[in-house]
């Protein structure tokens, strides 16, 4: 069973996100620093009648990297071709995609850190000089074919920017760090979603829901749907702060946006290792989760909220973690 606070896409959420997706930067809520920079770069590229420099968007899942890619294409007035790193298994797959691009088009590669090295190497000349050299045939009869490409913009999205090779990262002229959303922005997103789907919600309820959504629109919209169900069956259909608190408590989402897995991580650190330091591998084994899952899905939010510290010796639970879970904290 998937956890309610998982920031990866579940079920029909891709369709829901497409329905909610803003079309232009002025409609995009939050990520102001990234938006302000992109607005300038896009306008400058349009004035020069050039393709926008390649863009790298990085940050945790669910923060709107795919949405931002579509917004950029709309702002440029060009087509967007969408694919992902795991889908492009060999260089020929990438060549076929590049060959379909029109001048100025956007190629969006999600999970770009998962591109095979053989594919990544083809991208170098395509990104830098808009051409590719490919080998046709095999053995002594093989020959190199030079293909010119129209100017295009590559938008890469990744949750693990550190896994990108230096040569690939260096070819992105624009980088955008997608951060967890501020409470006010997330509240506005919840209210916008409720309005689009004709849900009746109070501002206080939207604010409480945003507070417990881990700074992530995808999670906020998912929780909103579950709270709506609760309001429909237990209440009178109106989503207010009382209904919201009851629903989220039933879903094991506390007032800091932590669920049972987050609390299990913190309790394990405190009860078994005296608050740490404890290695990530050891911690993962103790809570029966994959190391990569803990590192990518749980830890970033716990660090951002000040419940965990990274040290050279390992992870440590903070005084805030002790206080939140009701433990007495003795500073080491």
Swiss-Prot record:
GO biological process terms, semicolon-separated: DNA recombination; DNA repair
Residue span of region Small ATPAse domain (RuvB-S): 182-252
Q: Please list the residues that bind DNA.
A: 291, 310, 312, 315
Enzyme Commission no: 3.6.4.-
Keyword annotations: ATP-binding, Cytoplasm, DNA damage, DNA recombination, DNA repair, DNA-binding, Hydrolase, Nucleotide-binding
The enzyme's first-digit EC class, named in words, is: hydrolase
Q: Which residues bind Mg(2+)?
A: 66
Please list the residues that bind ATP: 20-21, 62, 65-67, 128-130, 171, 181, 218
> Which Pfam families does the UniProt record give?
AAA_lid_4, RuvB_C, RuvB_N
Keyword field contains rRNA-binding: no
| Region annotation Head domain (RuvB-H): where it falls in the sequence | 255-332
Q: What's noted about domains in the record?
A: Has 3 domains, the large (RuvB-L) and small ATPase (RuvB-S) domains and the C-terminal head (RuvB-H) domain. The head domain binds DNA, while the ATPase domains jointly bind ATP, ADP or are empty depending on the state of the subunit in the translocation cycle. During a single DNA translocation step the structure of each domain remains the same, but their relative positions change.
Q: Which family does it belong to?
A: Belongs to the RuvB family.
What binding partners and quaternary form does the record give?
Answer: Homohexamer. Forms an RuvA(8)-RuvB(12)-Holliday junction (HJ) complex. HJ DNA is sandwiched between 2 RuvA tetramers; dsDNA enters through RuvA and exits via RuvB. An RuvB hexamer assembles on each DNA strand where it exits the tetramer. Each RuvB hexamer is contacted by two RuvA subunits (via domain III) on 2 adjacent RuvB subunits; this complex drives branch migration. In the full resolvosome a probable DNA-RuvA(4)-RuvB(12)-RuvC(2) complex forms which resolves the HJ.
Which protein is depicted? Answer: Holliday junction branch migration complex subunit RuvB
